[in-house]
């Protein structure tokens, strides 16, 4: 994709790096929308039509090979991110799923470093990551996601991908989806884009889920055929941590009767606990609300070890076979040590109504309640706001008011 004439204007976001001794110090970052959300069109004289749709390789007439594809497909900048449902205000990032004019941008964005030319690389093994969230406008079926992906620091900037991270190129995750461009290059052979993925937060106001997803490849891997499938190189299900799945139903939800009351903002703390050799052993999630630490729930299910953290024993017992086979918690830690990119998004699910997240064993939502046609009746303008993104030493990113 060749960058076009339209200017790209990245919203600025203040984030924090924390130590026990020095507290949290502000840092400057910028936000970039995924490259495939940018307007992509054919070069002048090549007629109307785009350069391919999600799930498919690019069209052969404009993209017979990588070189022609780079010349024939122009990616424009985005001068006004608010038109895509993305706005920042100091330390806050707001993502709107639906705009007042009815458009549904469903944005996915990444965190750039202060140069805007590279992604901010997070190395979280042995550290913790914390943010504040307002999830009040996220009914059943919505998914506000904040997660890490083992993308290339420059968005794999290259001769035929001159835009790179500046334009949001290089996305990959453990689902190994086929997209018309991978690492900014025409995906002529229709391969899948795979990499390690750490889902810190996938949630709405009714249910919430943490899940490491391992792959047995480093960085972005182009899969083909069986490699892209369920038994392939990445763990598609992840090792999920959701209170409802272990019979704890009073922990998280809308109202005072829940320990975490999603009708008010709250703080989400995720610790990546390592052993002395620096290997990831456990992932520990808890919350802070109204100045009080809300400890993690403990599992309450037969056949599942009594625990308040994700570890190999828990993953094994909950049937996360692919996770265990493809590297398990130590493998996830190796990716977190190498460095991962922060992605944040908001979306709904036309096909499955997000029922894996909040229905049946996973939550209180009724069958079909999360259908997009129902969501808009309940909440015409679903959105999420993430504030005060901060990371650093264990115990440094949150405090309890005495």
Curated annotation (Swiss-Prot):
Glycosylation sites: 89, 247
Disulfide links within the chain: 18-24, 51-73, 63-69, 140-365, 172-195, 176-194, 215-234, 223-228, 239-315
A Pfam family it matches: Glyco_hydro_7
Name assigned to this protein: Endoglucanase 1
A Gene Ontology BP annotation from the UniProt entry: cellulose catabolic process
Modified-residue entries (Pyrrolidone carboxylic acid), positions: 1
Reactions catalysed according to its record: Endohydrolysis of (1->4)-beta-D-glucosidic linkages in cellulose, lichenin and cereal beta-D-glucans
Keywords per UniProt: Carbohydrate metabolism, Cellulose degradation, Disulfide bond, Glycoprotein, Glycosidase, Hydrolase, Polysaccharide degradation, Pyrrolidone carboxylic acid, Secreted
Originating organism: Humicola insolens (Soft-rot fungus)
Subcellular location: Secreted
